Design a protein with these regions (language model features):
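Bacterial N-terminal signal peptides that target proteins for export
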Residues: 1-9
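Bacterial N-terminal signal peptides
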Residues: 9-18
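His/Glu-rich zincin catalytic helix
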Residues: 20-144, 171-198
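Catalytic zinc-binding patch centered on the HExxH motif and its immediate surroundings
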Residues: 42, 53, 156-166
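Alpha-helix-centered segments that form part of catalytic cores
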Residues: 141-157
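Short, glycine/charge-rich beta-strand/loop segments that flank catalytic centers
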Residues: 167-170, 201-210
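Short acidic/His-enriched helical or mixed secondary-structure segments at domain edges of catalytic enzymes
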Residues: 206-225
Length: 225
């Protein structure tokens, strides 16, 4: 509930800034000589909201920045932050599933099997456990609805749906019509409060593929040096 309130407050502030940026009743900070005239609001719950006004089009560019990135990865599971970024697009209890009550026991079983797999050292036993994980994952996938988050964003007119993981941040990006900010806020509140981890295997393959593609990027090599 607290996170829901955070996002609703964020939505209200953004809407207020678009409608009456010059008469905001909220206290804010600013940076001297900032050409964008950004306003920095700190809500009672500690959430920081950065806002600038662009009246060229009736749209709002949104960034939800989380203070976690590659530097927070455990030594034995590097890439975890990037992997989780991908899993944030897999839905919640409300969307991304045909029947969450039927899906949940299988997702719980997958999580338990992975924990056993992690603690098992015998290679033959690990292979047997992983085979079981594959089987349960396949059954769970029958209840999942692929790309439903993207479809929800498209339905409200959003473009540029994306995310990226850096050294100390993970950022989720949308470009939305200004009259859809309430719907955007409700979806994001549900997404961040009730995210369901599903589609483990397929998304892991996607992350591996992105990593393989980056191995030939000179810019990426410099960044990771």
């Amino acid at each position: 509930m607290r996170k829901t309130i955070q996002f609703l407050q964020l939505a209200f502030l953004l809407l207020l800034a678009t409608a009456c940026a010059e008469t905001s009743p909220f206290k804010y900070e600013s940076v001297p000589n900032d050409p964008l005239k950004a306003r920095i609001y700190t809500l009672d719950n500690g959430l920081k909201v950065y806002m600038t006004v662009n009246k060229e089009t009736p749209r709002i560019q949104t960034y939800i920045a989380v203070r976690v990135g590659g530097k927070n990865d455990p030594a034995e599971t590097t890439g975890l932050a990037h992997y989780f970024e991908h899993l944030m697009f897999k839905g919640t209890q409300q969307f991304g599933t045909q029947n969450y009550e039927q899906e949940k026991p299988m997702l719980d079983q997958i999580e338990q099997l992975f924990e056993v797999y992690r603690k098992t050292t015998d290679e033959a036993e690990r292979q047997a456990i992983y085979h079981q994980i594959d089987s349960v994952s396949y059954e769970a996938s029958k209840l999942a609805i692929p790309n439903e988050y993207d479809k929800l964003m498209s339905a409200i007119g959003a473009t540029g749906t994306n995310a990226y993981t850096g050294f100390d941040q993970t950022v989720y990006v949308e470009d939305i019509p200004s009259n859809q900010i309430d719907n955007w806020a409700k979806i994001q509140a549900d997404r961040f409060e009730n995210n369901v981890i599903r589609g483990f295997h397929t998304e892991l393959e996607t992350v591996y593929e992105e990593k393989n593609m980056s191995l030939t990027s000179d810019g990426r090599k410099v960044y990771e040096a």
